[in-house]
Amino acid sequence: MPTVSMRDLLLVGSHFGHQTRYWNPKMKPFIFGARNKIHIINLEHTVPALNNALELVKKMAENKNKVLFVGTKRAASKTIKEQAARSGMPYVNHRWLGGMLTNYKTIRASIKRLRELETQMSDGTFDKLTKKEALMRTRELEKLELSMGGIKDMGGLPDVLFVVDVDHERIAIKEANKLGIPVIGIVDTNSNPDGVDYIIPANDDAIRAVQLYVGAFADAVLEGRNATAGTADEFVEVSEATEA
């Protein structure tokens, strides 16, 4: 199981929170103290919280559950897309559209339209259109790809959300709460932990820190999937041995 150590977290500055004047009092249990008017996060809480969440995600991947990676702010967007794609999980990294979970039927229609446009682009339909019409469809495709591209293969609601910066993604969390979908969240000292089932107190702004968390969750997914594949291989071998 891929685990993250306190040293790993210290190296990327996970312990640095926000300026003390911007703190959320609900994060008090996770704060070690303050240095130069910056809150310091108690990594004694972060390490077990993060590793327990990684174990949960690994087990979910073993059971072929879907983990939706969510991080739309600049510090997280690129990493969310890369690591979710690497682990074969859905993601939202541009902008959370209201109703992405609670109005999934409408979202499904948009995904269908995205697929239609992708087919038209690849089969030469765009080439037969007027320049203006082709340009309009290309723009529509780009817009849909930006907002829906990461969830087009999700095939239904996710089983868990992994969120970087819970305040920034509050709409996503509220939708998940409404549907009873558990939420794993990286929660900084200025954030409200309400609605987050698995709170990971940590810096959510430093790019290297975000890369560490998101990469670890992608690794956990891959390890869970590999464990499932390994079990399937063993089953085949046992069956063959029995038949022999």
Swiss-Prot record:
Pfam families, A to Z: Ribosomal_S2 (PF00318)
Isomerase in keyword set: no
GO molecular function list: structural constituent of ribosome
Name by which UniProt lists this protein: Small ribosomal subunit protein uS2
Family: Belongs to the universal ribosomal protein uS2 family.
Signal peptide: none
InterPro entries the UniProt entry points to: Ribosomal_uS2 (IPR001865), Ribosomal_uS2_bac/mit/plastid (IPR005706), Ribosomal_uS2_CS (IPR018130), Ribosomal_uS2_flav_dom_sf (IPR023591)
